[in-house]
């Protein structure tokens, strides 16, 4: 879905779990809420104006710089990190500290929190969370190719694979309290 939007020169700018819907009966994934999306020719807002959800923003988006599809891929990386670990890669007590971390500090390796994950998947996440857009996947299609390749690899018999609810059991669910 993101690759299609990016090929149309549209950058979502607010990829986060609430904007990704999955129909488990059909395995269809939909990206929703293109409310702050922009055509890449005009993907920079007024100077100093930042739109989106800060914890999921790329370093360049937080800095108010020009963004392209690779910024959405960074946000997707944050979303996948949270999906796999139940935690955000960057957490801070203030907006300034959060922005500093996103711009300057590497995310904790996903394998620290989930040592059972394939090394190749950890590398993909690390690439998605790269500070520089040039170091990320060039497109959603390139990312999908990497993820398909990983999914097609056999799972080691000794590897612990948690049930889906294990990975998100600590994440509060709407209407069920925190």
What are these regions (language model features)?
Residues 1-10:
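Protein kinase catalytic-loop region centered on the HRD/HxD motif
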Residues 13, 18-21, 53-159:
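C-terminal lobe helix-coil module of Hanks-type protein kinase domains
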Residues 22-26:
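Activation-loop N-terminal segment of eukaryotic-like protein kinases
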Residues 30-33:
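Pre-DFG segment of protein kinase catalytic domains
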Residues 40-43:
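Conserved catalytic-core motifs of eukaryotic protein kinase domains, centered on the activation segment
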Residues 50:
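Conserved, function-defining core regions and hallmark residues within catalytic/recognition domains
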Residues 163-178:
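C-terminal or otherwise distal, non-catalytic regulatory regions appended to signaling enzyme catalytic cores
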